[in-house]
Amino acid sequence: LSNIVVLDHIQDTNNFGAIIRSAAAFNFNIVCLPKKRSVNITERTFAVSSGGLENVSIVFYNSIFSLIKKLKALDYWTVGLEMDTEEDISNVNLNDQKVALFIGSEESGLSNEIQKKLDLISKINMDNKIESLNASVAAGIAMNHFFKKSS
């Protein structure tokens, strides 16, 4: 099985398309998103993904908590991206384990309830001139990290 990206209530079509594009580029062959309260696949998604949608499977889930449980049962290492944590993603080495990367909403990130269920919460180290990265940029950096570690 391949690496997976799990989106939790991403709302912006451009972010969604860019995440799909990065997922295809870095061998994250499945993108999961909630059935409700999430972005839709639109013509804009196709355009921004630049062919990524043809190389990535989109899977819808009902409950993120059930999904986390299923992924762990399939031996995925569940990793969330957040700003307020000590663990720098560049130090994370999962020794070729399958990764399920969790990306929270643009507004509020991953909820504390979700974070508690994941194996690891990590951040992208950056200069403090900027408070945060765009969700699709952060997702792309994290996917590239795991792609390089598995190459």
Question: Predicted regions span which residues?
Answer:
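RNA substrate-binding interface of SAM-dependent RNA methyltransferases
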Residues: 1-86
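Conserved sugar-transfer catalytic core signal across GT-A, GT-B, and GT-C glycosyltransferases
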Residues: 19, 110-113, 142
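Structured adenosyl-cofactor binding patch, chiefly the S-adenosyl-L-methionine
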Residues: 25, 46-52, 115-151
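Short C-terminal domain-edge/linker segments immediately following a structured domain
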Residues: 35-39, 61-65, 109-113, 131-136
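Short, structured secondary-structure boundary patches
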Residues: 51-57, 98-104, 147
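Active-site/ligand-binding-proximal alpha/beta "capping" segment
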Residues: 79-134
